[in-house]
């Protein structure tokens, strides 16, 4: 539990370490659910029921309930299928599941954010990050009891499907500051060589085998999940392609000396299933065999796969999958729906009624000012702004956080793309508040153990930024 990415411990058989992680994850889940249930007394009004059934909060929720019941346009959609499956499993009706499930899944979003902060540097500080995300106004308002809609999964899946690639990248790739040091050392300055030369060599020596079967399985499964999410929402095809491009870019730019081809090969374990589906998980199985370092035949296979012309052919295949379908046309169409002002329509004649554009009339797609956007990240503008600035620091120290960059962009683009995007900024601000505070406390309180510092970080953030807004 030191100031290192959790991926460093992936190869260690440290049962206590992982049990501690499970414990704090359950604490995050329990606290998030308890805080979410503070709204439960408000539902005791009989007017909020229809017979024995609670009324759902949005028309979209009834859209998915209808699909789960077997009629309407939502039949066969994953949201309706999931609702039907959970209702059958629990022996109840879809509308009851649609009422309770938003509060439950939003708690698992808190757990995923906790896991991200754990991976980026501190297990215990992740508790505060998870709760800050779960209770962020922009996410909370769209995931209250009865709000069964795609907002639940559009934040959950991007956090889930990128966690393993981020950990893998941080485990086997160079940190940005290390790259800068190498550039300075390579410039020929004698003082720089004396200052950093030995430390650079030591950090290169700790890098292990990026094709270990555990990593390959995690990358492959994350890729299949990424591919599957594209059936849930139109935003996922863009996010998955960004993730593939980022992993390839990091393998090219941040690879230690002599390991670029090996990292490009390992990145394919994620890229191919992400773009091609479960069928390409077979390539991950091939990489698992190539990762066995003790077998001479497997070593030869790995050497052959790492040849430049083989990698070029494989990545050309990734490129063809990347551009398959009418991707560019779809992207242009989707952006125009969000960003272009629709023309006002109406009838002819002097007394004709003038109708506002339907899309721009909806609250969730109205453009917001920057201060309004910050208020959706956290009720205090100053805290939200500090979180955004802190996230920049996190990116510099933990390049795996680059996988979260699209969420930051979507959150800030609420000024042009509408208020429904604000929830994407919640985990960004949470990460940007917790980790920098944890690192600063480590510097100030050097005698404290890292786990105690993490607990102190969570306690301070919960007392200052959560308790005042939940009447604790």
Region locations from a protein language model:
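Membrane-interfacial, low-structure loops and terminal tails that flank and connect transmembrane helices
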Residues: 1-18, 172-221, 263-267, 296-310, ...
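Transmembrane alpha-helix segments characteristic
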Residues: 214-222, 261-269, 307-319, 383-416, ...
């Amino acid at each position: 539990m030191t100031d290192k990415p959790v991926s460093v411990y992936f190869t260690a058989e440290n049962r206590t370490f992982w049990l501690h992680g499970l414990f704090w994850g359950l604490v995050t889940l329990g606290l998030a659910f308890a805080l979410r249930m503070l709204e439960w007394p408000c539902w005791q009004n009989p007017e909020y029921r229809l017979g024995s059934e609670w009324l759902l909060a949005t028309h979209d929720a009834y859209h998915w309930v209808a699909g789960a019941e077997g009629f309407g346009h939502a039949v066969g959609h994953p949201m309706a299928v999931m609702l039907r499956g959970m209702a059958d499993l629990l022996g109840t009706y879809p509308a009851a599941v649609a009422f309770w499930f938003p509060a439950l899944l939003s708690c698992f979003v808190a757990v995923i954010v906790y896991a991200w902060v754990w991976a980026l540097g501190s297990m215990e500080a992740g508790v505060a990050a998870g709760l800050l995300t779960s209770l962020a106004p922009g996410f909370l308002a769209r995931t209250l009891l009865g709000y069964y809609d795609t907002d639940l999964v559009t934040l959950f899946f991007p956090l889930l499907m990128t966690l393993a690639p981020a950990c893998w990248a941080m485990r086997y790739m160079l940190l940005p500051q290390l790259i800068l040091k190498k550039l300075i050392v390579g410039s020929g300055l004698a003082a720089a060589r004396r200052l950093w030369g030995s430390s650079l060599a030591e950090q290169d020596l700790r890098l292990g085998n990026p094709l270990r079967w555990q990593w390959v399985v995690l990358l492959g499964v994350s890729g299949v999940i990424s591919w599957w999410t594209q059936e849930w929402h139109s935003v996922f095809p863009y996010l998955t392609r960004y993730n593939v491009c980022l992993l390839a870019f990091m393998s090219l730019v941040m690879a230690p000396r002599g390991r670029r081809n090996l990292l490009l090969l390992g990145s394919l374990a994620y890229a191919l299933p992400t773009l091609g589906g479960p069928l390409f998980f077979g390539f991950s199985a091939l990489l698992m065999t190539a990762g066995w370092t003790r077998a001479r035949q497997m070593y030869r296979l790995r050497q052959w796969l790492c040849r430049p012309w083989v990698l070029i052919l494989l990545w050309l295949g990734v490129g063809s999958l990347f551009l398959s379908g009418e991707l560019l046309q779809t992207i242009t169409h989707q952006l125009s729906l969000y960003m272009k002002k629709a023309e006002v329509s109406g009838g002819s004649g002097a007394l004709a009624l003038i109708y506002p554009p339907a899309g721009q009339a909806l609250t969730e797609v109205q453009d917001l000012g920057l201060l309004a956007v910050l208020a959706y990240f956290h009720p205090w503008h100053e805290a939200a702004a500090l979180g955004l600035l802190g996230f920049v620091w996190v990116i510099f120290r933990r390049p795996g956080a680059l996988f979260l960059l699209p969420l930051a962009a979507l959150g800030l683009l609420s000024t042009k793309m509408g208020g429904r995007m604000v929830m994407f900024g919640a985990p960004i601000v949470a990460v940007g508040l917790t980790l920098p505070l944890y690192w600063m406390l480590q510097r100030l309180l050097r005698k404290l153990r890292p786990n105690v510092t993490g607990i102190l970080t969570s306690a301070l953030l919960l007392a200052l930024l959560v308790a005042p807004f939940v009447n604790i």
